[in-house]
Amino acid sequence: MAIRKLNPTTNGTRNMSILDYKTNLTGHAPEKSLMKILKKNSGRNNRGVITTRHKGGREKRFYRLVDFKRNKDNIEAIVKTIEYDPNRSANISLVTYLDGEKRYILSPKGIKVGQRIVSGENVDIIVGNSLELANIPEGTNIHNIELQPKGGGILARSAGSYAQILGKEESGKYVLIRLKSGEVRKVFAKCRATIGIVGNEEHSLVNIGKAGRNRHKGIRPTVRGSVMNPIDHPHGGGEGKQPIGRKAPLTPWGKKALGVKTRDNKKSSTKLIIRRRKESK
């Protein structure tokens, strides 16, 4: 999908860029039977307490029911549309099975309207088809990867993401995959994945341009802790502009920030990770 840069007619549009949806999307109205109302939570829990900061005030959305399991086996489906989904960075495609059922799936890169796709154990290695990892050859790019058999896709679902199959264990229980982050891990061979790369890979190259676009998405401003009062943040207080007064930066709740590992050491899936993801610089 192409990126269109706007003319600098105002300060807000000076560096703004947008995705040119007309070049890729079909422009159809979403399927009403696969939509439901999405309630706004504004980062609050059931008690009204803020659990996620910097959220609130977004546009109304309807949630699209996307099929991450791809469990309708050996029945061909025809791709009818490629649509925008406000709830994720990737686009979605409406597919109609030969028995009449309609479902939304993640739209892979290169998929076209009218293309036929299918799920099953021994289907062809074609973009959009879904099958078990044990039946996918090494070196194939995949997305929408399950972590538990029949549990639905968990990994590689955002725009432009994918994983690559590196090899298979002799026992046949696990398949080795490399994620886009550089992490290498084992996944059960009975888990399913979809062939191809998730589309709309230019999503990360868009320049927001002005604060109002983030407010439409429900992203509120982020305030520095050093300009707060001491009661609000460990970095707060002092006369005028002051250093944080600590050996290392802290979170608003007093825990160390920047460089602290947050993964639970007792997590059972840690033993399946062969190589950790690349450290950010």
UniProtKB/Swiss-Prot annotation:
The protein's superkingdom reads Bacteria
Could you list this entry's UniProt keywords, alphabetically sorted: Ribonucleoprotein, Ribosomal protein, RNA-binding, rRNA-binding
Q: Where are the transmembrane segments?
A: none
Q: Name one GO cellular component term.
A: large ribosomal subunit
Q: Which SUPFAM superfamilies match?
A: Nucleic acid-binding proteins (SSF50249), Translation proteins SH3-like domain (SSF50104)
Q: Which GO terms describe its molecular function?
A: rRNA binding; structural constituent of ribosome; transferase activity
Function recorded in the entry: One of the primary rRNA binding proteins. Required for association of the 30S and 50S subunits to form the 70S ribosome, for tRNA binding and peptide bond formation. It has been suggested to have peptidyltransferase activity; this is somewhat controversial. Makes several contacts with the 16S rRNA in the 70S ribosome.
> What protein family does this chain belong to?
Belongs to the universal ribosomal protein uL2 family.
How it assembles, according to the record, is:
Part of the 50S ribosomal subunit. Forms a bridge to the 30S subunit in the 70S ribosome.
Q: What is this protein's record name? A: Large ribosomal subunit protein uL2
State the organism's lineage.
Bacteria, Bacillati, Mycoplasmatota, Mycoplasmoidales, Metamycoplasmataceae
Gene symbol? Answer: rplB
